[in-house]
Amino acid sequence: MLDGASRLNELVARAASDGQPALGMTDHGNMYGVLDFYKECKAQGVKPIIGMEAYQAHEHRSERPSRRGRVDDTGGETEGGGKLYYHLTLLAENNTGYHNLIQLSSRAFLEGYYYQPRLDWDLLSRYSGGIIATSGCLGGHVLQRLLKGDEAGALAAAGRLQEIFGRDNFFIELQDHGIPDQHRTNPLLVDIAKRLDAPLLATNDTHYTHREDHEAHDALLCVQTGSTIAEP
């Protein structure tokens, strides 16, 4: 919550005006907006891709580790050196996948809530059918390992996801928002994709519709994190 600043009608209209045949929505940790998103896409002739940017526990959803330091995109570091949670992009390929996303979202709230609704490897294995997964953004398990210089750990995490979702349904995700960490890790992600024979997927981390909305979105993030616009 307090992350996306787009209004659905404006977002879908922008996609339609750009000639985009499809548009995906992956809200953080929930599927509250799925129905309205689906209806709006259908009304404007854009194919809806339903998904969720899930929060994944480091290992088990029952974990309740102590946090140390500042809150960041992954909730912050734990005393054990891990993260409170990681980001994982999940997309419904078909009706089976849609129903499995509902299961994952619901169980993350009911069984894994700790700062955020978290799922884990066990739930992913049980409800993987009909779902396409990606390695995710800088907050993902794979990239967090790369940012720590742990290329073997990143490869292992990516391999584990590929094993769960299947070779055809797991993608290595690449993003370029001008962020140095992305420039540094994208070649490493390409290498992981080659080693796993996994397909690549280029994405854009969209949180607002128009360029001029960036200041309002910045203020929204400050409300979420308890910081100020003056902070870097």
Language model: regions and residue ranges:
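Phosphodiester-processing cores and adjacent nucleic acid-binding clamps
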Residues: M1-P232
